[in-house]
Swiss-Prot record:
Protein name: Small ribosomal subunit protein eS12A
InterPro entries: Ribosomal_eL30-like_sf, Ribosomal_eL8/eL30/eS12/Gad45, Ribosomal_eS12, Ribosomal_eS12_CS
Location of the protein in the cell: Cytoplasm
Native species: Schizosaccharomyces pombe (strain 972 / ATCC 24843)
Disulfide bonds: none
Gene that specifies this protein: rps1201
Amino acid sequence: MSEQGDQIEQVDVVEEVEVEAAAPETVSVEDALKEVLKRALVHDGLARGIREASKALDRRQAHLCVLCESCDQEAYVKLVEALCAESETPLIKVADPKVLGEWAGLCVLDRDGNARKVVGCSCVAVTDYGEDSAALQKLLESFSA
């Protein structure tokens, strides 16, 4: 064997990929909310369900609350609205509990990344936004307007 026979040269290949980001003006509030909930889920900053959300709101740990409009328990709606008003936490209402459950990660993803077996969710509170993003800025801007 030669002196260099066992050594293999390693070549690093670096590819630059340009990704076109959507302009903040073209992102709707609903899309921004979906992105913020996804980032909060990754950073373990979501309180899912009425029990966890009401605890987070009562402790004033919640930065944002999302409530389902079609919640059949009127007492739940009054409780969440009162806790949000007391702590001055922004409240967003969503029409479908299945959509909110999908955004909050209460589903199983198939091989293609499509949500299956989605569980409905009545309330979600964001306790940690995770990293700063354009979607978060758009959402916070919509609250101040």
